[in-house]
């Protein structure tokens, strides 16, 4: 475990020598992060609205979490309540009025005490069962017969489904960063507010792309703060991170999207992880204070969730074998663990991470695991198909030896690379070149019947912290990416294929190819997939024109090829994989109701405004700008290729344009004896008195840029916002 301290200590020594000012002014430069107020999602008043909402959420420790049940017919609920409240229950119904509901009774256990309010909380856990696929339900939950308002939740297909992968939300991790225009670190509360806004945005963007996702997997580190020195009693009662859990659980979408959380190193040593989440099939194997391993099935897939903060490989082996035995006949086996054992970020070469690799990988291979999902390094990486990596004891380094070499490179921002033979031999040996499978059948983005495992490392889904990739890309890496923008993956599964697509949340462009693993496909499987695709033809008007054209062309090609009943297996697999990807890539058109409302209001404002220099009038240039913004919004409304993401961005940009227009109104300021534009201080400049919820100069960059379509019609100067992304020097702290 590597912690960078040299620069921090140097900064503190200098600070003490020079001044008695609080050392927080000299807080060490932290990792890259996404400063929420400058993101595209924060524009049009969204950030200010979030800040107001956050005030009602930040002290709410009682928010609900929903986790997949032991199989697709179940869901698990968990929430805090006052210890005086008893009898936790969940009701489920197919009717909004909750008629004909079924009631499920749960259990309570002691949780934590809020030291400020002296409120003692208990953890409520309820499992509901009997769920049918592709069905709309409504649920309420509560204690003492006090029920929440009904919430809609939809079950999805179990034979052809999609789930999301999110890496390291780590809400609150940006606390050491300094906001634009400030001199001190923002601290925990503001960092949680910042990171939670971005976390909300990632989930909303993911659901805009795939509204029928079955669930999400978080690769660990839901929160950030923990006490490494706490004894067991203190760890079980720890509450300093409850505000972070409040932020993590704050997205409204999580009230209807189950999440399977992995125990990360920041979660592992605090008891409240186990109070907030009701995991299925839990085990004492792989346990830390937060809990142990668990597993569940969904359709034809077994999901194995490992707590590898416990490094006892024999316990993980025993658990994996038990999970596989209990699951029975499944097509896919997916393991999730936190540490990126085949990643490419700044933790990936650490001896303790690599040591964990060589303990676990043989177990995965013995049990025919297909895909391993990880996080920890806050950067994206996809491995090649790997099998048979072996540790070279002769070149292995101790943690201290490795840190001495790595520090030189790290502290030079990788401009000075170590050429020491011992270090280079170590790095070469852990590239596992012998594990790279070269005899694969690959057609485009499809890999057929691979012998080996695909490893995915998820980037940060919240932008609370980013790490760099290491300067020497490992041989086992097929692709990697880091541009300090939150990302998520959409993973779709059916009986013979599994596809992974990964998106950046600012433009919603893919950061990597869609990779599809195709198992043995028979001619009958292809005919079934064609029939499934043809069923979508009646819904043509629901999808964006560009994705529909690609889908329709692929379907026609598949049907033509399938006319030959003597196709070889390789061609059948290729056609099947291509058709599945085309179906997965279909994007729904956006709902333009809100945009039309904003257009109507903007037109009314424009039509009622008068050009002139008198108070209450507007400059002609301002009217021209607003007219351009309105016309651009109308273009989005009339487009056949506008997804929900594009429509939402159009709403945001039109709101910005309206606000800018309103700020140009001529006002008479008696005290100054003159006429000025609204927002002016009377001398031609604009006041910029910063408050904690406001956004300083919006010329700051967050890495946001527009979708290709948005660039075409939304990024005109009249409504565009140039955004940049601050990327700060890394301080690696695990």
Please describe what each predicted stretch is.
Residues 171-175, 223-227, 263-271, 312-314, ...:
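Active-site environment of divalent metal-dependent phosphoester hydrolases
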Residues 213, 219-226, 327-347:
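Short acidic, glycine-rich surface-loop motifs adjacent to enzyme active sites
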Residues 521-701, 709-715, 719-729:
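Beta-rich interaction/scaffold domains
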Residues 122-128, 136-157, 178, 183-189, ...:
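Extended active-site neighborhood of metal-dependent phosphoesterases/phosphodiesterases
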Residues 31-262, 268-289, 318-325, 353-367:
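Divalent metal-dependent phosphoesterase catalytic cores across multiple superfamilies
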Residues 19-33, 696-707, 726-731:
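Sec-dependent signal peptide cleavage junction
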Residues 2-9:
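Bacterial N-terminal signal peptides that target proteins for export
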Residues 12-20:
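Bacterial N-terminal signal peptides
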């Amino acid at each position: 475990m590597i912690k960078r301290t040299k620069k921090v200590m140097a900064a503190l020594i200098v600070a003490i020598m020079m001044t008695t000012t609080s050392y927080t002014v000299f807080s060490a430069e932290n990792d890259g992060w996404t400063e929420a107020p400058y993101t595209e999602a924060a524009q049009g008043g969204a950030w200010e609205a979030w800040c107001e909402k956050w005030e009602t959420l930040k002290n709410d420790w009682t928010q609900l979490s929903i986790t997949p049940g032991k199989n697709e017919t179940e869901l698990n609920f968990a929430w805090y309540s006052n210890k005086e409240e008893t009898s936790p229950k969940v009701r489920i119904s197919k009717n909004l009025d909750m008629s004909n509901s079924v009631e499920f009774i749960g259990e309570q256990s002691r949780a934590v005490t809020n030291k400020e309010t002296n409120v003692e909380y208990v953890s409520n856990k309820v499992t509901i069962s009997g769920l049918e696929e592709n069905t709309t339900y409504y649920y309420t939950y509560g204690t003492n017969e006090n029920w929440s308002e009904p919430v809609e939740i939809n079950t999805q297909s179990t034979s052809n489904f999609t789930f999301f992968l999110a890496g390291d939300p780590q809400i609150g991790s940006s606390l050491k960063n300094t906001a634009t225009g400030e001199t001190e670190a923002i601290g925990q509360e503001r960092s949680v507010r910042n990171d939670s806004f971005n976390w909300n945005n990632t989930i909303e963007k993911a659901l805009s792309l795939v509204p029928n996702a079955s669930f999400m997997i978080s690769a660990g580190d839901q929160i950030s703060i923990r006490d490494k020195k706490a004894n067991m009693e203190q760890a079980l009662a720890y509450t300093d991170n409850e505000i972070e859990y409040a932020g993590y659980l704050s997205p409204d979408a999580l009230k209807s999207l189950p999440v399977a959380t992995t125990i990360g190193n920041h979660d592992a040593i605090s008891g409240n992880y186990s109070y907030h989440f009701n995991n299925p099939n839990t085990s004492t194997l792989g346990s830390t204070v937060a809990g142990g391993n668990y597993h569940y099935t969904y359709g034809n897939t077994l999901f194995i969730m490992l707590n590898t903060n416990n490094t006892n490989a024999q316990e993980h082996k025993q658990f994996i074998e038990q999970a596989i035995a209990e699951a029975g006949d499944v097509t896919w086996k997916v393991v999730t663990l936190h540490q990126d054992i085949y990643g490419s970020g700044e933790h990936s070469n650490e001896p303790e991470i690599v040591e964990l690799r060589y303990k676990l990988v043989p177990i995965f291979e013995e049990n025919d695991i297909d895909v391993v999902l990880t996080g920890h390094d806050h950067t994206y990486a996809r491995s090649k198909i790997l099998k048979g990596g072996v540790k070279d004891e002769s070149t292995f380094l101790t943690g201290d030896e490795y840190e001495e070499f790595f520090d030189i490179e790290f502290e030079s921002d990788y401009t000075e690379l170590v050429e020491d033979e011992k270090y280079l031999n170590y790095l070469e040996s852990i590239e596992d070149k012998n594990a790279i499978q070269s005899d694969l059948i690959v057609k485009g983005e499809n890999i057929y019947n691979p012998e080996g495992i695909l490893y995915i490392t998820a980037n940060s889904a919240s932008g609370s912290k980013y790490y760099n990739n290491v300067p020497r890309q490992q041989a086992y890496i097929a692709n990697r990416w880091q541009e300090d923008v939150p990302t998520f993956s959409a993973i779709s599964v059916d009986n013979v294929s599994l596809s992974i697509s990964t998106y950046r949340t600012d433009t919603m462009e893919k950061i990597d190819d869609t990779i599809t693993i195709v198992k043995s496909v028979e001619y009958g499987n292809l005919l079934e997939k064609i029939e499934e695709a043809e069923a979508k033809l009646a819904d043509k008007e629901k999808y964006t024109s560009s994705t529909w054209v690609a889908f329709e062309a692929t379907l026609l090609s598949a049907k033509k090829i399938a006319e030959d009943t003597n196709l070889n297996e390789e061609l059948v697999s290729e056609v099947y994989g291509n058709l599945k990807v085309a179906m997965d890539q279909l994007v729904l058109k956006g709902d333009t109701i809100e945009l039309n409302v904003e257009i109507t209001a903007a037109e009314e404002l424009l039509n009622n405004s008068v050009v002139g220099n008198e108070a209450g009038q507007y400059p002609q240039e301002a009217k021209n700008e607003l007219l351009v913004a309105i016309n651009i919004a109308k273009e989005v409304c009339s487009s056949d290729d506008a997804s929900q993401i594009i429509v939402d961005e159009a709403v945001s940009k039109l709101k910005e344009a309206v606000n800018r227009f309103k700020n140009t109104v001529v006002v008479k300021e008696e005290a100054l004896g003159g006429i000025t534009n609204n927002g002016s201080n009377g001398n031609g400049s604009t006041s910029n008195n910063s408050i904690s919820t406001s956004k300083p100069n919006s010329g700051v960059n967050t890495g946001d840029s527009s979708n290709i379509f948005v660039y075409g019609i939304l990024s005109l100067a009249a409504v565009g916002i140039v955004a940049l992304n601050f990327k700060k020097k890394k301080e690696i702290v695990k």
